[in-house]
């Protein structure tokens, strides 16, 4: 009698991938020729459990997708910047430090209003 054993390969979660993906994306952002998909404002309550609006710099879409989300005060100054890595029902984010190049890039894109 032969017994068959099935081994399921677990795909890594977004939480396991987010730091590596952010490192790769930072390299992309150093290239002046790099073109992201979109830059727009996501109003509060656009999505469930999203009370605060944010500026979104979207790099890729679908599964997986990734983006920067800048949360600003009433003077359009960033008070929090997050990098999100998302993939079909899973997602993870990390806080981007204020001294990161991406912070300055987002400030330029948002600009004074």
Which residues does each predicted region cover?
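Hydrophobic transmembrane signal anchors and adjacent membrane-proximal interface regions, especially
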Residues: 3-8, 70, 93-96
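Ser/Thr- (and often Asn-) enriched beta-sheet segments in non-cytosolic proteins
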Residues: 6, 58, 67, 80-85
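Intrinsic disorder/low-complexity segments enriched in polar/charged and small flexible residues
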Residues: 24, 57-59, 63, 86, ...
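Long, contiguous N-terminal structural blocks used for assembly/anchoring
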Residues: 1-50
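Generic detector of well-ordered alpha-helical segments enriched in charged/polar residues
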Residues: 15-19, 23, 69, 103-107
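Polybasic, proline/glycine-rich intrinsically disordered low-complexity segments
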Residues: 75-113
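Generic surface-pattern signal
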Residues: 23, 27-31, 73, 108-112
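Amphipathic, interaction-prone secondary-structure segments
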Residues: 38-75
């Amino acid at each position: 009698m032969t017994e068959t054993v099935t081994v399921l390969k677990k795909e890594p979660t977004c939480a396991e991938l987010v730091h590596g993906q952010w490192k790769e994306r930072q390299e992309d952002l150093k290239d002046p020729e790099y073109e992201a998909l979109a830059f727009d404002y996501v109003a509060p309550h656009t999505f469930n459990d999203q009370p605060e609006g944010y500026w979104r710099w979207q790099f890729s879409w679908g599964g997986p997708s990734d983006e920067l989300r800048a949360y600003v005060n009433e003077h359009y100054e960033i008070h929090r910047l997050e990098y999100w890595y998302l993939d079909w029902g899973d997602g993870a984010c990390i806080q981007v430090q204020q001294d990161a190049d991406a912070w300055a890039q987002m400030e330029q894109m948002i600009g004074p209003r």
